[in-house]
């Protein structure tokens, strides 16, 4: 009811001020309407006694009636009025409403002035003044305050919890000491052997780099240049951007580190030992007979087939075990094969590809063995023609 009374009082005051002598020169100076308007204007003053039927509250422009958006008054309006406005625009005769603080606001309720409205909305329609629906969920004690985006505005002590807490600083990068390397007999086949490595050193380069940057009490296992190169590599892995001076400082160390990795990468490629009887009998040493080509024998009893490559022997062993890991993914097919070339040959039956062409007649075939049979037909024809020619020459010679 108090809000309705304030709205009615505001509308009545606007209606009466439109008919004051300053706005209507035809009315007399001491007319009853002028006296009533002066009495109503003193209601909001600090020293005046408020009417018992109305609740004295600070003036809020957002509660004004739509008629308060336009004020076609003259410039001689008294400035002591609480609703005093600046002179109207000379061309339009319309004056936008200004934001001001009421005397009834206490020191604890003083808020920073709201920013000026957007030029495209001059009549108090800025998004700062018109609160969105999400502000209704805030408690009544939280008054809206304007905080600019570019500046760090100071908030009252009671509103500091509205801002999000600052992010914690990132932890400093630390290098952890890795576990010691296993014994040389337990090293996997992909490990990298290093000359002069102690029992506590690992064959993997990353382990040595991590141990080098671990710091005391462990002594570094690389010289000072390699340790600096490791620090530069760690900085690059963390995503840091090196400046011109930093890049010039670490450039030589990075180049030295890359040069030391080149011979290690050459020895990193090693094959798993073949478990065929021939390789097991020879002790797995390929340099025992360098002039002889190494052969891999099938260890299944009663087979004894020999292959020149370990991949061929593995494919043959899959034939013994019945394993078919290569499956056709064509729709409604699902056939499986022991070897990958068998699967590729089967896929040509689905696609219709004929990649083998006859050099004599140009006829194409899906399989190479079919082409070989077709080429033999051409060779047989040539032999028959040659034999027929020889038989014809023999009667003439007689």
From Swiss-Prot:
Zn finger (C2H2-type) start-end: 296-320, 326-350, 356-378
Motif 9aaTAD: chain residues: 187-195
Major localization class: nucleus
One BP term from GO: bone morphogenesis
Compositionally biased tracts (Pro residues): 163-174
SMART domains: ZnF_C2H2
Compartment(s) where it occurs, according to its Swiss-Prot or TrEMBL record: Nucleus
Span list, region Disordered: 160-215
One matching Pfam family: zf-C2H2
SUPFAM superfamilies for the chain: beta-beta-alpha zinc fingers
GO MF entry, a single one: DNA binding
Keyword hit for Iron-sulfur: no
GO CC terms, sorted: nucleus
InterPro entries xrefs: Znf_C2H2_sf, Znf_C2H2_type
Key words of the record: Activator, DNA-binding, Metal-binding, Nucleus, Repeat, Transcription, Transcription regulation, Zinc, Zinc-finger
PANTHER family attached to this UniProt entry: KRUEPPEL-LIKE TRANSCRIPTION FACTOR, TRANSCRIPTION FACTOR SP5
Task performed by this protein: Binds to GC boxes promoters elements. Probable transcriptional activator that has a role in the coordination of changes in transcription required to generate pattern in the developing embryo.
Domains as described in the record: The 9aaTAD motif is a transactivation domain present in a large number of yeast and animal transcription factors.
Family: Belongs to the Sp1 C2H2-type zinc-finger protein family.
The protein's name in its UniProt record: Transcription factor Sp5
Species name: Mus musculus (Mouse)
Annotated gene: Sp5
């Amino acid at each position: 009811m108090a809000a309705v009374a304030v709205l009615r009082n505001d509308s009545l005051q606007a209606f009466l001020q439109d008919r004051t002598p300053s706005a209507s020169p035809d009315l007399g100076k001491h007319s009853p309407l002028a006296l009533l308007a002066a009495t109503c204007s003193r209601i909001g003053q600090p020293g005046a006694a408020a009417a018992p039927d109305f609740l004295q509250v600070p003036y809020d422009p957002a509660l004004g009636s739509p008629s308060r958006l336009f004020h076609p008054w003259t410039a001689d309006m008294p400035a002591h009025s609480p609703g005093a406005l600046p002179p109207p625009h000379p061309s339009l005769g319309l004056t936008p409403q200004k934001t001001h603080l009421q005397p009834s606001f206490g020191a604890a309720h003083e808020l920073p002035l709201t920013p000026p409205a957007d030029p495209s909305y001059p009549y108090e329609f800025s998004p700062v003044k018109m609160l969105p629906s999400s502000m209704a969920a805030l408690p009544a004690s939280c008054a809206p305050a304007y905080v600019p985006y570019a500046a760090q505005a100071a908030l009252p002590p009671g509103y500091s919890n509205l801002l999000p807490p600052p992010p914690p600083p990132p932890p400093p990068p630390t290098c952890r000491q890795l576990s010691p390397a296993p014994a040389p007999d337990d090293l996997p086949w992909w490990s990298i052997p290093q000359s002069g490595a102690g029992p506590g050193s690992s064959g993997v380069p990353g382990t040595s780099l991590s141990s080098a940057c671990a710091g005391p009490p462990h002594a570094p296992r690389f010289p000072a240049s390699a340790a600096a190169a490791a620090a530069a590599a760690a900085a690059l892995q963390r995503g840091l951007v090196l400046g011109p001076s930093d890049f010039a400082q670490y450039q030589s160390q990075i180049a030295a580190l890359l040069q030391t990795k080149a011979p290690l990468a050459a020895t990193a490629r090693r094959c798993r030992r073949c478990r065929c009887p021939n390789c097991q009998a020879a002790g797995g040493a390929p340099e025992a007979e360098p002039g002889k080509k190494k052969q891999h024998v099938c260890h299944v009893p009663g087979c004894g087939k020999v292959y020149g490559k370990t991949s061929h022997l593995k494919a043959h062993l899959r034939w013994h075990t019945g394993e078919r890991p290569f499956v056709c993914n064509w729709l409604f097919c699902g056939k499986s094969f022991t070897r990958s070339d068998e699967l590729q040959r089967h896929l040509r039956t689905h696609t219709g590809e004929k990649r083998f062409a006859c050099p004599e007649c140009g006829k194409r075939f899906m399989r190479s063995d079919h082409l070989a049979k077709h080429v033999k037909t051409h060779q047989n024809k040539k032999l028959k023609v040659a034999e027929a020619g020889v038989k014809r020459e023999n009667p003439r010679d007689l």
